């Protein structure tokens, strides 16, 4: 805890929710910085365009870093990850990685959806801007809370994301389909449509080649 410093945010800028997350952080950062004058937030992400770098402000401690050469190094040296994700679907990789690397975070309900089940979150979940700022500051300063949040993250990974939890069922399913491939294909209506149109495209391409060769 004592060897870590600064906040981070990370995400590929080709993905719109990541850009909107950074815009939200820019909006919230001033209130965080007022309470933590020595702290900075480092924004990482590949494909950062000029509009992203325009948000860079060293005086405010809002630092656009661009692509991270080593995600492991970034996650192991930061103190808190901030992810006020406004929209999106599915498991958020940045939050799962924050758990794996022992980095507590503050995120939105969208960010945390479908991730922790009945386990306590590794930090805080809130959609309220004032509360987001309060929790970010609290998590940054309170060592006991920070360590408890770190432990929560490890438990979530252990109980919900370990490979061993899914591997046997996945392998069994693959074997089952392989042994009953024809039956599976007959029940896979969408797959049949895709297969049909794949063959049709090949059919008409071959006809086009035949006509071209006649000339």
Locate predicted features.
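Conserved catalytic-core segment of nucleotide-activated headgroup transferases in glycan assembly
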Residues: 1-72, 76
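Glycine-rich phosphate-binding loop at the start of an alpha helix
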Residues: 72, 92, 147
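Active-site donor-sugar recognition loop in glycosyltransferases
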Residues: 70, 87-90, 112
């Amino acid at each position: 805890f004592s060897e870590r410093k600064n906040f981070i945010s990370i995400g590929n800028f080709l993905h719109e929710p990541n850009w909107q997350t950074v815009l939200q952080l820019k909006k919230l950062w001033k209130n965080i910085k007022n309470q933590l004058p020595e702290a900075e937030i480092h924004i990482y992400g590949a494909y950062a365009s000029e509009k992203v770098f325009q948000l860079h402000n060293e005086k405010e401690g809002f630092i656009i870093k661009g692509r991270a050469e080593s995600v492991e190094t970034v996650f192991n040296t930061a103190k808190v990850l901030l992810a006020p994700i406004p929209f999106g679907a599915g498991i958020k990789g940045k939050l799962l990685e924050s758990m794996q690397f022992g980095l507590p975070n503050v995120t939105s309900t969208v960010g945390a959806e479908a991730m922790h089940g009945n386990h306590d979150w590794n930090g805080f979940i809130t959609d309220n801007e004032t509360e987001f700022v309060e929790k970010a500051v609290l998590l940054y300063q309170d060592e006991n809370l920070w360590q408890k949040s770190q432990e929560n993250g490890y438990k979530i990974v252990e109980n919900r994301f370990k490979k061993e939890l899914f591997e046997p069922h996945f392998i069994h399913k693959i074997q089952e389909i392989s042994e009953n491939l024809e039956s599976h294909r007959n029940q896979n209506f969408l797959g049949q449509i895709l297969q049909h149109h794949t063959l049709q495209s090949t059919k008409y391409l071959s006809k086009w080649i035949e006509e071209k060769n006649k000339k």
